[in-house]
């Protein structure tokens, strides 16, 4: 008789079959439950404290899952779904994670009835395909032919308002209106129209800076770029018109040699000669920049005090230690070429701007570059009373920018407030009857999961969720396809379009895709093998993501 077979290293744990699947489902559902209360315009905020003690207060799904240090591999799949949603459309992250959790919760009910995971996956995929078809039928095309027209701007404002209603920490109408106006103006400038009537919206041309002080209403849109730096020398001009700008990633200083070297000096004359040579070298670099016509120098690296003196004598405005990301944006905006070798610089390397000026913003000085060669480069300067308000305003701004980009890339909208989910649930139940076999059960569970979205919206708005769901079902059965939860006023509206609660089709479709992909990925797993943790000399555990995982049992998200 053969002895026991040792397949894994000592300490390795394994769970398989339904145990592994239930463990994974529980982890994912636990994460989704945490995010449920943050969904919608009345969603609550989460306070996240990282290992350094830094505090983040937000209800933005992408930020929440990024800040939480989640360990369980199944829950990490939902985090990846949120990241995919954020990368693709920049909005709907909370919805994607919550819906994935709901789909898995419903799948577990089917597993209890001995429905095989493969059948559930096939049913969910069929439901997704049908749901995307229905969304296209429910969608309304909007006219974005002329973005400067009042009609188009009014439509865009409605879309941004829906996105902002659930995001903005300050919550004041004036602040929200200010941000909405900034977003629409910025998008209108950078958008490029395609032959088919849609737009390419390069968001990398929109730079966002934050400066503490004042209020959100003091935020401004700059037609150019803003550098959070000040002019390096008191003798330099503070304002340069018709600026010819040299963008450097080379240092304007004498760099130390990479080899180890010592200089032996035996007399004061040698010291003077040494310093004179350094000054001559720096003067040559400044003279070279002046000779190609530069009257503004923006440098990624340092500028020596002696070089600053020579630049000031030439009347050149200079800024140093500018971030690499800003240098790259300047290259695009100014039509410049980044200069790596000053001695090889030519006039063709220079960028152009109508005005470069140092201004005081709050307690700090900033350099404004306006009238750039590329007129589509813009900078939004956010103001706010504290860092947390500024951070949340920036997240709100990014979501709003992505929301507008989505609708310009695909100018189709649907009703918000859970109206689409309610109508999808109704039609998917009808569709399920036409599908044979146990897949019908999975499609019905998909419909149930979708219906929980308006229930969550109702609950966060302080409404009775079950009563709200019953009312919604009745209205949709009567043909009110746009009926949904008016969370702001705490009631059910017959037409969410009329009260300007609308969402881009691109976001809504991607939410469904991301949620189904994450849920099906978890349902496919039937074996969980966790390697034993490595131990240090002191007996502390070490290892990768799977180190120290405990299975089976209740999952830990920490």
From Swiss-Prot:
Superkingdom of this protein's organism: Archaea
Chain intervals with Low complexity compositional bias: 548-558
CDD domains recorded: cpn60 (cd03343)
Region described as Disordered: 536-558
InterPro entries in the record: Chaperone_TCP-1, Chaperonin_TCP-1_CS, Cpn60/GroEL/TCP-1, GroEL-like_apical_dom_sf, GROEL-like_equatorial_sf, TCP-1-like_intermed_sf, TCP-1_chaperonin, thermosome_alpha
PROSITE patterns: TCP1_1 (PS00750), TCP1_2 (PS00751), TCP1_3 (PS00995)
GO molecular function, one term: ATP hydrolysis activity
UniProt function note: Molecular chaperone; binds unfolded polypeptides in vitro, and has a weak ATPase activity.
Protein's UniProt name: Thermosome subunit alpha
Species for this entry: Sulfolobus acidocaldarius (strain ATCC 33909 / DSM 639 / JCM 8929 / NBRC 15157 / NCIMB 11770)
Gene this protein is translated from: thsA
């Amino acid at each position: 008789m053969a002895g026991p077979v040792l397949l894994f290293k000592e300490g390795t744990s394994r769970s398989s079959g339904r145990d592994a699947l239930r463990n994974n489902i529980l982890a994912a559902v636990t994460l989704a439950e945490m995010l449920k209360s943050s969904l919608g315009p009345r969603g609550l905020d989460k306070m996240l404290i990282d290992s350094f003690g830094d505090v983040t207060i937000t209800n933005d799904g992408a930020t929440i899952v990024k800040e939480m240090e989640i360990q369980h591999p199944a829950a990490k799949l939902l985090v990846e779904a949120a990241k995919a949603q954020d990368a693709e459309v920049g909005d709907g992250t909370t919805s994607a994670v919550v819906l994935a959790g709901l789909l898995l919760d419903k799948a577990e009910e089917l597993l209890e009835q001995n429905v095989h995971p493969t059948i559930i996956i096939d049913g969910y995929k069929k439901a997704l395909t049908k749901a995307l078809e229905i969304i296209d039928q429910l969608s309304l095309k909007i006219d974005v032919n002329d973005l400067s027209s009042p009609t188009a701007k009014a439509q865009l404002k409605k879309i941004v308002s829906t996105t902002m209603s659930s995001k903005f920490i300050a919550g004041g109408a004036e602040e929200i209106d200010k941000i909405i106006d900034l977003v629409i103006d910025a998008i209108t400038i950078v958008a490029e129209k395609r032959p088919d009537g849609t737009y390419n919206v390069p968001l990398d041309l929109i730079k966002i800076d934050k400066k503490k002080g004042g209020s959100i209403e003091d935020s401004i849109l700059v037609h150019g770029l803003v550098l959070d730096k000040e002019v390096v020398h008191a003798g330099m001009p503070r304002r340069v018109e018709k600026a010819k700008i040299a963008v450097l990633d080379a240092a304007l200083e004498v760099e130390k040699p990479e080899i180890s070297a010592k200089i032996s000096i035996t007399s004061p004359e040698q010291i003077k000669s040494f310093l004179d040579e350094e000054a001559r070298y720096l003067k040559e670099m400044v003279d070279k920049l002046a000779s190609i016509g530069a009257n503004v120098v923006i440098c990624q690296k340092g500028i020596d005090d002696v070089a600053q003196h020579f630049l000031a004598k030439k009347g050149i405005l200079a800024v140093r230690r500018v971030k690499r990301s800003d240098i790259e944006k300047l290259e695009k905006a100014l039509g410049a070429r980044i200069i790596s070798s000053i001695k090889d610089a030519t006039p063709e390397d220079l960028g152009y701007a109508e005005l470069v000026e140092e201004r005081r913003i709050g307690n700090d000085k900033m350099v404004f570059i306006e009238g750039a060669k590329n007129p589509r480069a813009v900078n939004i300067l956010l103001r706010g009373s504290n860092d947390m308000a500024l951070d949340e305003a920036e997240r709100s701004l990014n979501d709003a920018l992505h929301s507008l980009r989505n609708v310009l890339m695909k100018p189709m909208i649907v009703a918000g407030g859970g109206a689409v989910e309610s109508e999808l649930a109704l039609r998917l139940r009808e569709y399920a009857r036409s599908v044979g076999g146990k897949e019908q059960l999975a499609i019905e569970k998909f419909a149930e999961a979708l219906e929980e979205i308006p229930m969550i919206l109702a609950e966060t708005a302080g409404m009775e969720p079950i009563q709200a769901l019953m009312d919604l079902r009745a209205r949709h059965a009567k043909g009110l396809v746009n009926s949904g939860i008016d969370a702001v006023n705490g009631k059910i509206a017959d037409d969410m379009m009329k009260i300007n609660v609308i969402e881009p089709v691109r976001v809504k479709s991607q939410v469904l895709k991301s949620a189904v992909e994450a849920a099906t990925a978890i349902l496919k797993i039937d074996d969980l093998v966790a390697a034993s943790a490595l131990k240090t000399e002191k007996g502390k555990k070490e290892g990768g993501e799977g180190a120290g995982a405990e299975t089976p049992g209740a999952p830990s998200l920490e």
